[in-house]
Every structure is written in structure tokens, then in C-alpha cells.
Amino acid sequence: MFRTLVKTESMALESQTVSVRYFELRTLRGGRRYSAEIWLAPGDRVILDGDSVVNLEARAARLVPATVYSRLLAGRANAA
């Protein structure tokens, strides 16, 4: 089973840009599944799975800001 790149986009949050790549995967039964690979930093990524690219785009739009800001807060807490 191979993934096919369907779409790429960048999301800008204040001073950071996050890369999002969307893939399509054919299942053994001929169905289609989709995944989004969100690159937050080198070696730091989040992978989402879904039934459609539209669904993944909506989930990524909500998840990316929350993830970036929570990691910023966690970094500040560790520095203090």
C-alpha cells in the first residue's frame, strides 16, 4: 500500500509557518483513506487520519494552532 501526495499547504501562525501534506491511501478492498502530516519542527510532526481531505483540512485548522500554542506554553513552563 502506497501513499499518494494529494495536496500541500502552509499554515502561518504569528512568527511560525507549519507545513501540512495530505496523502491518499488505497485500502485492500479498494476504498480510500486520507492522512495529513503536520510538520511542526524538524523531527516533530503530527499525523491525522480521516475519510476525506476536506475533513482533514478542518481538523488541521483547529489542531495546528492549539498544538503550537500549547507547546509554547510547555516550553515556558520548563524554562521557569
List where the protein language model places each region.
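Negatively charged, low-complexity tracts enriched in Asp/Glu with abundant Ser/Thr
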Residues: 1-21, 77-80
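Mixed-charge, Lys/Arg-enriched low-complexity segments
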Residues: 42-80
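N-terminal targeting/docking segments
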Residues: 7-9, 25, 56
